[in-house]
Amino acid sequence: MGEAVKDGREEVIQAWYMDDSEEDQRLPHHKDPKEFVSLDKLAELGVLSWRLDADNYETDEDLKKIRESRGYSYMDFCEVCPEKLPNYEVKVKSFFEEHLHTDEEIRYCVAGTGYFDVRDRNEAWIRVLVKKGGMIVLPAGIYHRFTVDSDNYIKAMRLFVGEPVWTPYNRPHDHLPARKEYVDNFMINASA
Protein backbone atom coordinates (compact mmCIF):
# COMPACT_ATOMS: atom_id res chain seq x y z
CA MET A 1 0.00 0.00 0.00
CA GLY A 2 1.53 3.24 -1.12
CA GLU A 3 1.08 6.62 0.49
CA ALA A 4 -1.15 9.13 -1.23
CA VAL A 5 0.83 11.79 -3.04
CA LYS A 6 0.38 15.10 -1.24
CA ASP A 7 -0.39 18.15 -3.33
CA GLY A 8 2.31 20.72 -2.50
CA ARG A 9 -0.17 23.53 -3.08
CA GLU A 10 -2.00 22.50 0.11
CA GLU A 11 0.98 23.71 2.15
CA VAL A 12 0.44 27.29 0.95
CA ILE A 13 -3.25 27.36 -0.04
CA GLN A 14 -6.12 25.96 2.02
CA ALA A 15 -9.86 26.51 1.81
CA TRP A 16 -12.88 25.94 4.03
CA TYR A 17 -16.51 26.91 4.41
CA MET A 18 -16.90 29.96 6.63
CA ASP A 19 -19.09 30.34 9.67
CA ASP A 20 -21.69 33.11 9.85
CA SER A 21 -19.96 35.00 12.66
CA GLU A 22 -19.73 38.79 12.56
CA GLU A 23 -16.42 38.65 14.49
CA ASP A 24 -13.25 40.31 13.18
CA GLN A 25 -12.91 39.57 9.45
CA ARG A 26 -9.22 38.76 10.00
CA LEU A 27 -10.01 35.61 12.01
CA PRO A 28 -10.15 32.20 10.26
CA HIS A 29 -13.96 31.82 10.62
CA HIS A 30 -14.04 28.01 10.51
CA LYS A 31 -17.38 26.26 10.86
CA ASP A 32 -17.77 23.90 13.83
CA PRO A 33 -16.95 21.19 12.90
CA LYS A 34 -14.46 22.41 10.31
CA GLU A 35 -15.50 21.83 6.70
CA PHE A 36 -12.53 21.99 4.33
CA VAL A 37 -12.80 22.52 0.57
CA SER A 38 -10.41 20.83 -1.86
CA LEU A 39 -8.36 22.73 -4.41
CA ASP A 40 -10.16 20.65 -7.07
CA LYS A 41 -13.50 22.03 -5.83
CA LEU A 42 -12.05 25.56 -6.08
CA ALA A 43 -10.98 24.80 -9.65
CA GLU A 44 -14.59 23.81 -10.43
CA LEU A 45 -15.49 27.39 -9.43
CA GLY A 46 -12.77 28.73 -11.73
CA VAL A 47 -10.23 29.46 -8.98
CA LEU A 48 -6.79 28.29 -10.12
CA SER A 49 -3.82 27.78 -7.81
CA TRP A 50 -0.10 27.11 -7.81
CA ARG A 51 2.72 26.69 -5.33
CA LEU A 52 5.79 28.66 -6.37
CA ASP A 53 9.19 29.58 -4.95
CA ALA A 54 8.51 32.96 -3.31
CA ASP A 55 12.15 33.36 -2.26
CA ASN A 56 13.28 33.32 -5.89
CA TYR A 57 10.38 34.85 -7.81
CA GLU A 58 12.75 36.92 -9.98
CA THR A 59 14.25 33.76 -11.50
CA ASP A 60 11.46 31.20 -10.99
CA GLU A 61 11.03 29.29 -14.26
CA ASP A 62 7.58 28.01 -13.20
CA LEU A 63 6.34 31.57 -12.69
CA LYS A 64 7.87 32.57 -16.03
CA LYS A 65 6.03 29.72 -17.80
CA ILE A 66 2.71 30.62 -16.15
CA ARG A 67 3.11 34.28 -17.12
CA GLU A 68 3.94 33.38 -20.71
CA SER A 69 1.16 30.81 -21.15
CA ARG A 70 -1.52 33.05 -19.60
CA GLY A 71 -0.33 36.34 -21.12
CA TYR A 72 0.51 38.10 -17.84
CA SER A 73 2.70 40.88 -19.20
CA TYR A 74 2.45 43.42 -16.35
CA MET A 75 3.52 42.88 -12.75
CA ASP A 76 3.73 44.99 -9.62
CA PHE A 77 3.63 44.51 -5.86
CA CYS A 78 1.13 45.53 -3.23
CA GLU A 79 1.92 45.52 0.49
CA VAL A 80 -1.12 45.51 2.73
CA CYS A 81 -0.06 46.50 6.24
CA PRO A 82 -0.56 49.52 8.52
CA GLU A 83 2.97 50.82 7.87
CA LYS A 84 2.82 50.73 4.05
CA LEU A 85 -0.80 51.34 3.06
CA PRO A 86 -2.24 54.83 3.63
CA ASN A 87 -5.68 54.77 5.30
CA TYR A 88 -5.06 51.11 6.17
CA GLU A 89 -8.26 50.38 8.13
CA VAL A 90 -10.46 52.05 5.50
CA LYS A 91 -8.69 50.18 2.67
CA VAL A 92 -8.94 46.79 4.41
CA LYS A 93 -12.66 47.36 4.96
CA SER A 94 -13.12 48.33 1.29
CA PHE A 95 -11.25 45.19 0.10
CA PHE A 96 -13.71 43.17 2.22
CA GLU A 97 -16.76 44.53 0.37
CA GLU A 98 -18.14 41.79 -1.88
CA HIS A 99 -17.24 42.67 -5.47
CA LEU A 100 -16.22 41.36 -8.86
CA HIS A 101 -13.82 42.44 -11.59
CA THR A 102 -14.19 42.28 -15.36
CA ASP A 103 -10.69 40.74 -15.60
CA GLU A 104 -8.97 37.95 -13.72
CA GLU A 105 -7.51 38.81 -10.33
CA ILE A 106 -4.07 37.22 -10.08
CA ARG A 107 -2.27 37.34 -6.74
CA TYR A 108 1.01 35.67 -5.78
CA CYS A 109 1.82 35.88 -2.08
CA VAL A 110 5.55 36.50 -1.64
CA ALA A 111 5.31 37.28 2.11
CA GLY A 112 2.66 37.21 4.80
CA THR A 113 -0.84 35.76 4.54
CA GLY A 114 -4.23 36.73 3.16
CA TYR A 115 -7.77 35.43 2.85
CA PHE A 116 -9.70 35.49 -0.42
CA ASP A 117 -13.37 34.65 0.13
CA VAL A 118 -15.38 33.33 -2.83
CA ARG A 119 -18.98 32.16 -3.24
CA ASP A 120 -19.85 28.57 -4.09
CA ARG A 121 -22.78 27.59 -6.33
CA ASN A 122 -25.16 27.88 -3.36
CA GLU A 123 -23.92 31.35 -2.34
CA ALA A 124 -22.02 29.99 0.70
CA TRP A 125 -18.70 31.67 1.49
CA ILE A 126 -15.50 29.68 1.01
CA ARG A 127 -12.44 31.19 2.69
CA VAL A 128 -9.19 30.65 0.76
CA LEU A 129 -6.04 31.07 2.86
CA VAL A 130 -3.03 32.04 0.76
CA LYS A 131 0.41 31.90 2.38
CA LYS A 132 3.89 32.74 1.11
CA GLY A 133 4.44 30.81 -2.11
CA GLY A 134 0.77 30.49 -3.00
CA MET A 135 -0.59 31.98 -6.19
CA ILE A 136 -4.27 32.10 -7.10
CA VAL A 137 -6.28 33.31 -10.05
CA LEU A 138 -9.85 34.43 -9.44
CA PRO A 139 -11.79 34.36 -12.71
CA ALA A 140 -13.42 37.49 -14.12
CA GLY A 141 -16.97 37.80 -12.84
CA ILE A 142 -16.63 35.84 -9.58
CA TYR A 143 -17.95 37.60 -6.48
CA HIS A 144 -15.23 37.72 -3.86
CA ARG A 145 -13.61 39.78 -1.12
CA PHE A 146 -10.17 39.99 0.51
CA THR A 147 -8.71 40.54 3.94
CA VAL A 148 -5.41 40.04 5.70
CA ASP A 149 -5.26 37.69 8.68
CA SER A 150 -4.64 38.81 12.26
CA ASP A 151 -0.94 39.45 11.48
CA ASN A 152 -2.09 42.38 9.29
CA TYR A 153 0.48 41.75 6.57
CA ILE A 154 0.68 40.46 3.03
CA LYS A 155 2.99 41.33 0.19
CA ALA A 156 1.50 40.16 -3.07
CA MET A 157 2.66 40.25 -6.65
CA ARG A 158 -0.20 41.46 -8.82
CA LEU A 159 -0.20 40.20 -12.39
CA PHE A 160 -2.21 41.57 -15.30
CA VAL A 161 -2.77 40.95 -19.00
CA GLY A 162 -1.64 44.25 -20.51
CA GLU A 163 -2.03 47.48 -18.58
CA PRO A 164 -3.20 47.08 -14.99
CA VAL A 165 -6.93 47.46 -14.51
CA TRP A 166 -8.31 46.91 -11.03
CA THR A 167 -11.84 48.20 -10.91
CA PRO A 168 -14.07 46.62 -8.26
CA TYR A 169 -17.80 46.42 -8.96
CA ASN A 170 -19.58 45.95 -5.65
CA ARG A 171 -22.43 43.48 -5.58
CA PRO A 172 -24.89 43.48 -7.27
CA HIS A 173 -23.45 43.81 -10.77
CA ASP A 174 -25.02 40.72 -12.32
CA HIS A 175 -25.70 42.62 -15.58
CA LEU A 176 -22.00 42.88 -16.48
CA PRO A 177 -20.89 40.58 -19.35
CA ALA A 178 -18.04 39.21 -17.19
CA ARG A 179 -20.55 38.08 -14.54
CA LYS A 180 -22.87 36.51 -17.11
CA GLU A 181 -19.94 34.64 -18.67
CA TYR A 182 -18.77 33.44 -15.25
CA VAL A 183 -22.26 32.19 -14.36
CA ASP A 184 -22.57 30.41 -17.72
CA ASN A 185 -19.13 28.78 -17.48
CA PHE A 186 -18.92 27.87 -13.80
CA MET A 187 -22.35 28.02 -12.19
CA ILE A 188 -24.88 26.76 -14.75
CA ASN A 189 -22.95 24.52 -17.17
CA ALA A 190 -20.76 23.03 -14.46
CA SER A 191 -23.73 21.99 -12.33
CA ALA A 192 -25.68 20.51 -15.26
Swiss-Prot record:
Belongs to the acireductone dioxygenase (ARD) family. GO terms for biological process: L-methionine salvage from methylthioadenosine; regulation of cell division. Ni(2+) binds at residues 99, 101, 105, 144. It catalyses: 1,2-dihydroxy-5-(methylsulfanyl)pent-1-en-3-one + O2 = 4-methylsulfanyl-2-oxobutanoate + formate + 2 H(+); 1,2-dihydroxy-5-(methylsulfanyl)pent-1-en-3-one + O2 = 3-(methylsulfanyl)propanoate + CO + formate + 2 H(+). Disulfide bonds: none annotated. It is an enzyme of class 1 (oxidoreductase). Its EC number is 1.13.11.54, 1.13.11.53. The lineage of its organism: Eukaryota, Viridiplantae, Streptophyta, Embryophyta, Tracheophyta. Pathway: Amino-acid biosynthesis; L-methionine biosynthesis via salvage pathway; L-methionine from S-methyl-5-thio-alpha-D-ribose 1-phosphate: step 5/6. This is Acireductone dioxygenase 2. Catalyzes 2 different reactions between oxygen and the acireductone 1,2-dihydroxy-3-keto-5-methylthiopentene (DHK-MTPene) depending upon the metal bound in the active site. Fe-containing acireductone dioxygenase (Fe-ARD) produces formate and 2-keto-4-methylthiobutyrate (KMTB), the alpha-ketoacid precursor of methionine in the methionine recycle pathway. Ni-containing acireductone dioxygenase (Ni-ARD) produces methylthiopropionate, carbon monoxide and formate, and does not lie on the methionine recycle pathway. Keywords: Amino-acid biosynthesis, Cytoplasm, Dioxygenase, Iron, Metal-binding, Methionine biosynthesis, Nickel, Nucleus, Oxidoreductase. One of its GO terms (cellular component) is nucleus. Its cofactor is Fe(2+); Ni(2+). It is found in: Cytoplasm; Nucleus. It holds the Pfam family ARD. Binds either 1 Fe or Ni cation per monomer. Iron-binding promotes an acireductone dioxygenase reaction producing 2-keto-4-methylthiobutyrate, while nickel-binding promotes an acireductone dioxygenase reaction producing 3-(methylsulfanyl)propanoate. One of its GO terms (molecular function) is iron ion binding. Fe(2+) binds at residues 99, 101, 105, 144. It comes from the Eukaryota. InterPro entries: ARD (IPR004313), ARD_euk (IPR027496), RmlC-like_jellyroll (IPR014710), RmlC_Cupin_sf (IPR011051).
